[in-house]
Curated annotation (Swiss-Prot):
It comes from Methylobacterium nodulans (strain LMG 21967 / CNCM I-2342 / ORS 2060). Has an important function as a repair enzyme for proteins that have been inactivated by oxidation. Catalyzes the reversible oxidation-reduction of methionine sulfoxide in proteins to methionine. This is Peptide methionine sulfoxide reductase MsrA. Its EC number is 1.8.4.11. Belongs to the MsrA Met sulfoxide reductase family. GO terms for molecular function: L-methionine-(S)-S-oxide reductase activity; peptide-methionine (S)-S-oxide reductase activity.
Length: 221
């Protein structure tokens, strides 16, 4: 990743890069399971976006969950610039976050399990950074369009916040909101650590377990 760009505040409207009207080329199929990266996905498949630092390691966390995960992809969301490049996102002038798109079957992969994986795989108290990766594109974020799923996400945040406070951590800084447009990242980023097993992964959790199941219920149950 690009360590030398470390913008730690969101850009002002007059700083936003213009982007482009056409999507960037990306991979057509998932490198691990061979499924098409882009929708439309099969009936019953839901999607959520997770930002937890560098998306290379974050994506691997989710595809490794196995059954119930239809496909994963990395991209940019929660910003302003249309169809940004990776280099543009790293300037901090697009407003985007590096995120993982997870398309999953809630009958086989409860949303709770995705939430637990999300919270336990990073430190959600660090603001505009994850470890050595500093910048607005590394902020903790959870993006779902469905209001019920958003309520589940907020309940899980509150439960995990209590667990973190008990261990001496500060408040959670995760943003939970509607995703807005999702832009697929360039092909070389997709399933990066499957193609490059020794590649960089800056992901690291707090070691605090997320008490999913306390006031957080899966709608499919």
């Amino acid at each position: 990743m690009l360590f030398f760009r470390k913008r730690a505040e969101m850009p002002a409207p007059d700083q936003i890069l213009p982007g482009r009207p056409t999507p960037l080329p990306t991979a057509e199929r998932h490198f691990v399971n061979g499924r098409p990266l882009k929708g439309p996905y099969p009936e019953g498949i839901e999607t959520a976006l997770f930002g937890l630092g560098c998306f290379w390691g974050a994506e691997r966390k989710f595809w490794q969950l196995g059954d119930g995960i239809w496909v994963t992809a990395v991209g940019y969301a929660a910003g302003t610039t249309p169809n940004p490049t990776y280099e543009e996102v790293c300037t901090g002038l697009t407003g985007h976050n590096e995120v993982v798109l997870v398309a999953y079957d809630p009958a086989a992969m409860p949303f709770e399990r995705l939430l637990k994986t999300f919270w336990e795989s990073h430190d959600p108290t660090q603001g505009m950074r994850q470890g050595n990766d500093v910048g607005t594109q590394y902020r903790s974020g959870l993006y779902v369009a469905d209001a019920e799923r958003r309520a589940q996400a907020e309940a899980s945040r509150d439960a995990y916040g209590e667990a973190l406070r008990a261990k001496g951590y500060g408040p959670i800084t995760t943003e939970i909101r509607d995703p807005g447009p999702f832009y697929f990242a360039e092909a070389y980023h997709q399933q990066y650590l499957a193609k490059n097993p020794a590649g960089y992964c800056g992901l690291g959790g707090t070691g605090v377990a997320c008490p999913i199941g306390t006031g957080v219920r899966n709608a499919a149950e």
